[in-house]
A protein has these predicted regions:
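C-terminal motif of bacterial Sec signal peptides marking the signal peptidase cleavage site
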Residues: 16-19
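Positively charged n-region of N-terminal signal peptides that target proteins for export
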Residues: 1-5
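Alpha-helical repeat scaffolds
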Residues: 204-214
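Alpha-helical linker/edge segments of TPR/alpha-solenoid repeat scaffolds
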Residues: 197-204
Length: 214
């Protein structure tokens, strides 16, 4: 009976400690990144680099990948890039993340991904949108270039028109994704990359504000 009671106490204590640890992580206002990577990268360095600040010893974090896993902790809420040592970067996709408070799970591979916090879930959606856009554009670009080389103006113009339409769609969706977020690092990033209007230099040298998408 005493043994059963003792085991019960240990179990309750363990649950309490796990609960306290989770609660602390949720309230420490830091971004906890847990990552997995291809086992071929074991023993290689992986870096967490700020996107909009100089990469220095103070701003860049690095760890060694062990057993296909790695971890980072950041207390600066900003857009960062996770990338492996450039000697081993071939075939491995860099990954944009937002180092906002919370627990973030990332996968670094030929197609990298992230999930776990609101901005990073939205960033993953934008990444997938971007990848679909790039993929669907490829055949139109190839056909357009071949048509230009062959002197087929009509087909070249048709492909250009299709690409313009796809690009306009992509820009509009990216802008409104950023706008829907109201605030935060990803909101700022998307609206900077995909504004409603931008200043364009005209043939006569004047500067006009024109739509970035329709």
């Amino acid at each position: 009976m005493k043994n059963i009671f003792f085991v019960g106490i240990i179990a309750l204590t363990t649950l309490a400690l796990v609960g306290c640890s989770t609660s602390t992580r949720q309230t420490d206002e830091k971004c906890h990144i847990t990552g997995t990577a291809n086992n071929n990268l074991n023993g290689k360095k992986i870096f967490l680099v700020p996107m909009d600040r100089p990469a220095t010893m103070e701003t860049v974090d690095s760890v060694v990948i062990e057993n296909g896993t790695f971890e980072f902790t950041s207390d600066v809420n900003e857009i960062k890039v996770i990338r492996v040592d450039y000697h081993f970067r071939s075939g491995v996709q860099d990954l944009l993340v937002v180092s906002e408070p919370g627990d973030l799970e990332v996968v670094i591979d030929s197609i990298s991904s992230a999930k776990g916090t609101p901005q990073n879930d939205s960033l993953q959606r934008w990444k997938e949108l971007t990848e679909r856009f790039n993929k669907v554009c490829v055949p139109f670009r190839i056909t357009g270039k071949n048509a230009e080389k062959a002197g087929n103006v009509a087909v070249a113009e048709e492909m250009k028109s299709k690409l313009d339409s796809l690009r306009n769609n992509y820009r509009r969706q990216s802008h409104y994704l950023g706008e829907s977020m109201k605030e935060g690092a990803l909101h700022d990033f998307l609206l900077k990359q995909f504004p409603k209007t931008y200043k364009k230099k005209m043939p006569d040298g004047s500067i006009e504000e024109v739509p970035f998408f329709k």
